Amino acid sequence: MFTVQALVSRSFATVIVAAWLTQPASAAEVPCLILPYVEVSVVSPTEGLIETVAVERGDVVKKGQVLVMLEASREKAQQAVARAKAEQEAAIKTSRVKQAFAARKVARATDLLKTSSIAQHELDEAETEKALAETSLLEATENKRLAELDLQRANAELALRTVKSPINGVVVDRLQHPGELAKRDPPILKLAQIDPLRVEIFAPLSMLNQITVGQQAEVRPSDQPGGVYAAKVTIVNRVVDSASGTFGVRLEIPNHDLKLPGGLQCTVKFNGAKK
């Protein structure tokens, strides 16, 4: 279970707007902030004692990777019982034998009745036994189906004791440890997806019709590791913030080698028309 924070916080927006206001009017570059694409708080979908936490802060994780395992002895035992019941065939086999025997008995009784070798009530009894055998087989089949569904439920409950990563990313923080009771607050781990990174800016109103989705840009981090990074506009907010006279723009930077961290201040220069 996870919660995703995908919007720039008000404090970040304040930093960006303040930086823009200090730029000269002729400045070609707009202040920006490099952030993780998404940030995820990993919580357990069910309460339980934490048995293992497989990652540490700073570790790179893959989507679907096991992060946390809760103590699950009861769930494993329930799964074993459910599997044993679901795999039982004896009741169905017995019912099939009884049904086949009853069918043969009815056939014999029918032939004997034609020659008046038995009374009608004996045929009736044979047909009743056949009907009961068919009902018994149906009941055994339904019970097996219920056992299979119970096994599915047991498997699902056991699966809830394993928490997997919802994203490709890095571990930002580890807040709970083995021996503690897993609960929603605090989360067990915090993850961040940093490939791609998102770049948030608040551009001046004069640029509203100059920036388009798909447009290319160059992003320069203000701090280490420095350099220039190619980015592409993915969102242009069409609602203007009247207080600051700005509008929001989001870009994405590929970060396959994960060398560029999130949280850096930067400047962005747009490369003209949409490509």
Language model segments and positions:
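Bacterial N-terminal signal peptides that target proteins for export
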Residues: 1-13
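N-terminal beta-strand block that forms a small beta-sandwich/beta-barrel module immediately after a flexible targeting
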Residues: 16-49, 230, 234-235, 262, ...
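Short coil-to-beta-strand transition motifs
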Residues: 25-29, 164-166, 221-230
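Short beta-strand-turn/beta-hairpin segments enriched in glycine/proline and small hydrophobics
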Residues: 28-45, 149-166, 191, 234-240
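Surface-exposed patches in structured soluble domains
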Residues: 33, 51-54, 60-66, 157, ...
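Amphipathic alpha-helical coiled-coil/rod segments that serve as protein-protein coupling scaffolds
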Residues: 62-167, 175-178
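Structural microfeature recognizing short secondary-structure transition sites
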Residues: 173, 227-275
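Low-complexity, intrinsically disordered
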Residues: 194, 213-230, 258
